[in-house]
């Protein structure tokens, strides 16, 4: 691994993962590169098992770009969470980000989305968790 990549791998992720009842809330505070996205996915899936979380909210409100790799990683994260017994909701997609994603044909589908944390937590507590996806 080149020195720059190794240094980035050692950097703390700018993501906070907090417990909220039986759920985890992961707030992404700044853009993550591909290797950081993969570390985030690994760490979150690990915490789902550690805390026996039944639901996960991923808050992306701070992001001004969600590229195709980030979409793929979030979809994969939701699939891994589902295999571990937890549902996932992505919240906080900004209007400009949503318009760009639609223009480029990228999507978070089938991952449910919600406007904000409150709505996302509400979706996790519903028996039918389809969301806006």
PLM regions and their residue ranges:
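Hydrophobic "anchor" residues on beta-strands that sit immediately upstream
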Residues: 23, 55-57, 112
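Short acidic-hydrophobic, aromatic-tinged amphipathic segments that line or gate anion-handling sites
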Residues: 110-120
């Amino acid at each position: 691994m080149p020195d720059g990549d190794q240094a980035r791998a050692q950097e703390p992720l700018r993501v906070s993962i907090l417990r909220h009842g039986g759920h985890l809330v992961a707030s992404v505070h700044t853009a993550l590169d591909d290797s950081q996205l993969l570390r985030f996915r690994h760490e979150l899936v690990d915490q789902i098992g550690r805390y026996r979380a039944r639901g996960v909210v991923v808050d992306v409100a701070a992001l001004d770009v969600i590229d195709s790799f980030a979409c793929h990683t979030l979809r994969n994260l939701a699939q891994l969470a589902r295999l571990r017994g937890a549902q996932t909701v992505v919240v906080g997609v900004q209007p400009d980000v949503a318009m760009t994603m639609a223009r480029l044909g990228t999507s978070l589908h089938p991952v449910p989305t919600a406007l904000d944390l409150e709505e996302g937590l509400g979706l996790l507590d519903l028996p039918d968790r389809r969301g806006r996806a």
